[in-house]
Amino acid sequence: RGCGTAGCRRTWRGRPTAVGRVALHWAAGAGHEQAVRLLLEHEAAVDEEDAFGMNALLLSAWFGHLRILQILVNSGAKIHCKSKDGLTLLHCAAQKGHVPVLAFIMEDLEDVALDHVDKLGRTAFHRAAEHGQLDALDFLVGSGCDHSVKDKEGNTALHLAAGRGHMAVLQRLVDIGLDLEEQNAEGLTALHAAAGGTHPHCVRLLLRAGSTVNALTQKNLSCLHYAALSGSEDVSRVLIHAGGCTNVADHGASPLHLAVMHNFPALVQLLINSDSDLNAMDNRQQTPLHLAAEHAWQDIAEMLLIAGVDLNLRDKQGKTALAVAARSNHVSLVDMIIKADRFYKWEKDHLSCRDLSDPSGKSLSFKQDHRQETQQLRSVLWRLASRHLQPREWKKLAYSWDFTEAHVYAIEQQWTGTRSYQEHGHRMLLIWLHGVSTAGENPSKALFEGLVTIGRRDLAELAVASVGAYI
């Protein structure tokens, strides 16, 4: 029923939703031709925008409803409209891959700018590449669009396709001849973008096409850095196989630093196996082990310790990794580092217990011992520390077993109350047990000799009697 009053027109317009959508928007977006015609007959505002600046014409292009688009154009809709993000009809159709709509826009509408940019500085060509719309991209190329244009961040279509992992589009762009080494405003190449986006297939494609594997950004970050930041083992493996450098020379964070910092254990192991510099220092003079100690990453710390990291290196504050762990009260890590330090000092003076002929090397661990075969002895050591050793005696015993001042100081940083010395002594004894077990020594004999050395023969005889069954 026709009505020309303002109130009736408001009824046909419909009440706007929270995002400013009215009836014509919904009808155009859904492709309801009859509803669109009816609304237009009742004087619905053809160019009315929603909260995002999208009108019925833009929505029909976005959803690919060519017939609706034609109806709206014939009803006087403004064809040079754009959303608040700067999206034109061409942007909308290209991003969603609607080639028939693109063809109508280019062939039937007047004065359409093929390379018009949105608020990000991106053309329809950028949008098609970024969203993996190969057919739309081919249409735009055939229409003569600018291939090399950059957005406001300096990205080419190659950057955008690589970063999103669109293989088919990426291959087409490579075939077209886009510059593989073109850098964006931060110095990233398309290979950086593919690596950071964790797209190993795109990384392989670009490397085969001739991308430089060790290209650096303005912050001296390689593609392997970006793979490490995202924790991608697959991308890292591809880059390393292609000659990607695992180290840096300017005291920046290495890929290993980044993998440790973000707690990617499997990637850390891959980088260790790929001859990464375990002792590389970042701009705080921290090694990867310093970072593991700071964040209490036990699994990663063990990998680094087993790999043979230098435990004597100090950061800008003059702290070793042991001191960092102690300061942060990461008790388990403190004990692991002390075990490793004592092990490597023992190893230096003896045949390597990690020799291929020696199976003990295959199970080397510095973590807390939970083995069934040592349970009885560990119980004896706990009773010794908690019931029999006097407050200062654990330290005398530690020094007799070649614990260093740094070791003892690190253990003492833990505070559990006035009887903290009991826990300190227990931890020291467990660290000692790790050493004698690794060395293949008789723990009963070594414990007896140690207690006698500090003047506690009575306790030595008691302890040996307690562990007799274990021996």
Swiss-Prot record:
Record-annotated Death domain positions: 379-467
Stretches forming ANK repeats: 19-48, 52-81, 85-114, 120-149, 153-182, 186-215, 219-248, 251-280, 284-313, 317-346
UniProt entry keywords in alphabetical sequence: ANK repeat, Repeat
InterPro entries listed in its UniProt record: Ankyrin-DD_containing_protein, Ankyrin_rpt, Ankyrin_rpt-contain_sf, DEATH-like_dom_sf, Death_dom
GO biological process: signal transduction
Cross-referenced PROSITE patterns: ANK_REP_REGION (PS50297), ANK_REPEAT (PS50088), DEATH_DOMAIN (PS50017)
SMART domains: ANK
Protein name per Swiss-Prot or TrEMBL: Ankyrin repeat and death domain-containing protein 1A
Encoding gene (name): ANKDD1A
